[in-house]
């Protein structure tokens, strides 16, 4: 678990590695903003370090493009990444971030059907797992996923305004003790 948390923050495929690929001074960020985010992520690493009881089997890259549906509810999950053991919040945020991402691109906020499915996704997970700690450990995983979808390399056609909203989300989630999935729009401001 300690290694998974460290890797989420500092691995070349995760937060620090994604930031390595950002331009030196992108228009949508203040000078030094990535450095301040990285410092906050290191604090999260140490906050979560002792939660080894949360170690569980994970997919590691559980997003919509890795779920292939056939008939009805029959599906296959593709492309397991970064090992089979980790933190459930990683898989949850990999999927959930997409609902935020697509809604923010179109509306500048989480709304409509995407808000409904986002909230149902969270409620279903919490109802089935009784994971009372999830909302207090989820921040660095949402930060990682927000850094990916705001990336100029991975998503070159996004507007600066959309990237800024995603970074507002990233900041506000990292600054919160607990994530309120019913109030996502407050994190986007």
What function would you assign to each model-found segment?
Residues 32-40, 112-121, 162-173:
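Extended, well-ordered alpha-helical scaffold segments
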Residues 42-90:
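Active-site acidic catalytic loop and adjacent metal/ATP-binding pocket
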Residues 1-47, 151:
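Active-site catalytic-loop/activation-segment of kinase and kinase-like phosphoryl-transfer enzymes
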Residues 152-189:
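Regulatory N- and C-terminal appendages and interdomain linkers associated
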Residues 130-142:
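All-alpha amphipathic helical-bundle segments outside canonical DNA-binding/catalytic cores
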Residues 9, 24-35, 108-112, 137, ...:
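Charge-dense, low-complexity intrinsically disordered segments
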Residues 89-129, 143-161:
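Active-site activation/catalytic loop segments of kinase-like enzymes and analogous catalytic loops
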């Amino acid at each position: 678990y300690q290694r998974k948390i460290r890797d989420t923050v500092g691995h070349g495929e995760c937060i620090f590695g994604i930031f390595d690929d950002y331009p030196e001074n992108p228009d949508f960020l203040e000078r030094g903003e990535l450095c301040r985010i990285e410092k906050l992520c290191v604090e999260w690493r140490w906050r979560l370090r002792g939660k080894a009881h949360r170690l569980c089997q994970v997919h590691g890259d559980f997003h919509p493009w890795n779920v292939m549906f056939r008939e009805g509810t029959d599906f296959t999950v593709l492309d397991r990444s970064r090992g089979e053991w980790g933190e459930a919040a990683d898989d949850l945020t990999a999927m959930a971030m997409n609902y935020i991402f697509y809604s923010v691109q179109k509306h500048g906020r989480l709304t409509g059907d995407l808000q409904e499915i986002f909230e149902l996704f969270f409620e279903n997970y919490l109802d089935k797992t009784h994971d009372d700690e999830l909302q207090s450990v989820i921040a660095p995983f949402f930060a990682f996923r927000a850094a990916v979808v705001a990336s100029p390399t991975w998503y070159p056609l996004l507007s600066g305004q959309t990237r800024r909203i995603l970074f507002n989300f990233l900041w506000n989630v990292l600054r919160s003790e607990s994530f309120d999935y019913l109030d996502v729009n407050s994190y986007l401001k």
